[in-house]
Amino acid sequence: MIAIIAEKPSVGQDIARVIGATEKKDGYMAGNGYLVTWALGHLVSLAMPSAYGYGKASHEDLPMLPEPFQLVVRQIKTDRGMVTDISASKQLKVIDEVFSKCDSIIVATDAGREGELIFRYIYHYLGYTKPFKRLWISSLTDEAIRAGMSNLKDGEAYDSLYHAADCRAKADWLVGMNASRALALASGMPNNSLGRVQTPTLAMICSRYKENRDFVSTPYWQLHITLERLGEFRQFAHIEDFKSKEQAEATHARFSPDSTALITKVERKRTYQQAPLLYDLTTLQKDCNTHHDMSAEKTLSVAQALYEKKYISYPRTGSRYISHDLMEQVYDSLWKIATMPEFKEYGKRFDFEHLNMRSVDDDKVTDHHALIITGVEPEELNAHEQIVYTMIAGRMLEAFSPRCEKESLVMEATAEDMKFRSRSTTIVNPGWRAVFARKEDAEKDETEANKGTARFTEGEQIPVTGYGTAQRKTIPKPLYTEATLLAAMETCGRNITDEKAKEAMKELGIGTPATRAAIITTLFKRDYIERSGKALVPTEKGLYIYEAVKDMQVANVELTGSWEKTLLQIEQHTLETRSFMHSIESFTSQVTREVLGLKFPAPKQRSLPCPKCGTGKVMIRPKVAKCDNPDCGLLVFRKVLNKELNEQHLEQLLSSGTTKLIKGFKGKKGNSFDAAVAFDDEFNVTLAFPEKKRGKKR
């Protein structure tokens, strides 16, 4: 008998159906010589500090360096603290029963670091030593499962992948647990946390926010002239900006209705914009955020759902290339995409005979290839699934389309002994850009705001028919959006536009394609950042933490990127795990010392007018907001269910009696809902739910 373990029930049931294990049991499927069971995500994880005898945070216990680390059944946070997840415990017993009945195991968890870790932690926790093989596939279609089952890999071949995942988990534990406890001791605020990856990411957001907020805009002036001939005109700009209005006006005064300009240079150049590579997860997340305002977490969850429905390949990929042996499948997919309603017009002229092959490179495909659609026809996609599927399908058309051909035109002229310049770009052949034909893409082609279409010849003398000045001002770097933050995480904050250079930097990025969405989500959950429109900005709490640790190693973006590279070296057999763990333990000790040595200023205690008594001041403290009038008694606990009210929420509640809608409350049964926090008639805190929209009567 052979056991197969998948990562989720739906995947396990699909595999069972394909291999003929059709008899349904409690927590597994049986038949045809197989027992197919499944995990429910991470059933086993690293134990919390209490398992090693550590109580509340104390200076004497830090740094905590467990040796060895202990594994425990997944735990969940409740009002009584951390308790064992009953559903995880139950499924582990099923897995234990299945493994005990079988001679060998086939590992069918997701083909990546986390999928490998999920199985290995279960395997080690249950104490098994039975041999296992690896089902390593990039899609869940029936054909892919059959092909994978006939080409199983030795489990030992993925030991280094497991070691990298295990080291990453232990590194996160060491830095996160120790730095957070040190922060609690140094600041006197126990509910804040630091992390190996979350803190450098917070530092990037805070640094950009402060740079943007504190930017002092400087005015400057531009001088422009209009040249016209035979009813056609072109606007030229002075080659230098003026720092003062007086200087600009003095220069402007040199012109008269009789002024002419001599064309001194006309340069035409053909330029080409290569088709983009196929999507990896991060570029998909960036584009879904830019064009459809979807968060990185939402994009990943939708892509995962499409993968489990067999509509797309494995989503957590870091590759933007495919191998030559996939081209037959891709060719068939391109025919299908070309008939989709969204691409039908472009599909009529798509050149199937001369495909752009820059996304096809066997040497650049590692564990998984780029994101592509499968041959399975989608059925009943919801709105977000339709968006993500269309984005992936459209990117395939773009990637295999011709490059975009442009003509750039630069003209220079001399007028009144001054030099002027006009730049413009015209698309000659849109190539891949015609797939989506986005308006915002077309606007990027206008390199300067010069108007007109006239084209002059070198040596011509052209009348100056208009001239004027315009005031401009310098602008700061924009705040991060999720799309631009993801790009910055890939390059550790470096501004890199060249695609080849970006690919080379991937080894030094913060996080991985599979983890970046979770990092951003963690910052939201910690109340360290919030959204302002599409921008990500720090909360008061987030800025407070950043100011305290910004110069420390725990917030060092490039150092965090170097850790990612060492994890990749472990995965590639070029670095020993002991070497990495020794470095992380030393780093943890250093970070702990640094944080414990912090001198935190007492947080400013804000106060707001009391809406209940009208005379007292409501003092805002870390855990409560309380009126200072002893006869009033207004008291607001800042923790409501799983949410903590930030100062903005308290301002809304105390000034208008209700907060704005707060998303992501969790009830006692774990159900998620949205609500506002409000006062009732007696100033008790309650939840207010949005009214459901009623349809129009017919």
Regions from the PLM with identified roles:
Residues M1-A169, W173-V175, P476:
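Intrinsically disordered, low-complexity regulatory segments
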Residues M1-A3, D110-A111, G188-N191, R268-L277, ...:
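Conserved short loop/turn motifs at secondary-structure junctions
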Residues I2, G81, Y125, D214, ...:
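Basic, low-complexity terminal or inter-domain segments flanking catalytic cores
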Residues P9-A16, G33-V36, L40, H59-L62, ...:
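Amphipathic alpha-helical transducer elements in NTP-driven molecular machines
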Residues E23-G27, K130-F132, G155-S160, R181-L185, ...:
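Active-site phosphate-binding and catalytic loops of NTP-dependent enzymes
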Residues S87, S100, D142-I225, R268-K269:
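C-terminal or mid-to-C-terminal helical accessory/interaction module adjacent to the motor/catalytic core
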Residues K243-Y279, Q285:
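Metal- or metallocofactor-binding catalytic centers and their adjacent structured scaffolds
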